[in-house]
Amino acid sequence: AVEVFHNFTLLHDDIMDRSDTRRGKPAVHTRWNDNVAILSGDAMMIYAYKLLCGCDRRVLPQLLETFNETAIGVCEGQQYDMDFESRDDVTVDRYLEMIRLKTGVLLAGALKLGAICAEAQPWQAELLYNFGINVGLAFQLQDDLFDTYGDAAVFGKPIGGDILAGKKTFLLTTALKTADAAT
């Protein structure tokens, strides 16, 4: 369910970012059109819930609560990401909160869902959740570096796309924080 949800977000993200490439291949909206990508993403979201509902009924309420919180967090993070493109006041802390929501919450939610399915203790699920947040932050920070300094053949998309799209990345927010008026 989490993987299907994640891929749904990528379909919609590619439209919002006008990214033509995903994993080295044409993005769905590029190969077909925006409508196909939106409807495919919507169907994937519904299918993710269908998969989730196949889990043990004893833990299903907890799973649904965690899945919904995860989905809302990811959507909030995506909205921040879009909003930041037209803002000049994005700080490193705001950027870190955006990637915590957009990327960290997804990984954290996946780990917590696994813990719930395994009937782990709540404190264990919370430790896994916090670990997922930190892995997500590290992943997104590394992704920012790859977008600037990576190899397009390895990265699976053109280098510099975030810069061209006006994305507020860690590199940009840090540069703006340390720059002075003369720079």
Regions of interest found by a model, annotated:
Residues 1-181:
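Mg2+-dependent prenyl diphosphate-binding active-site environment of isoprenoid biosynthetic enzymes
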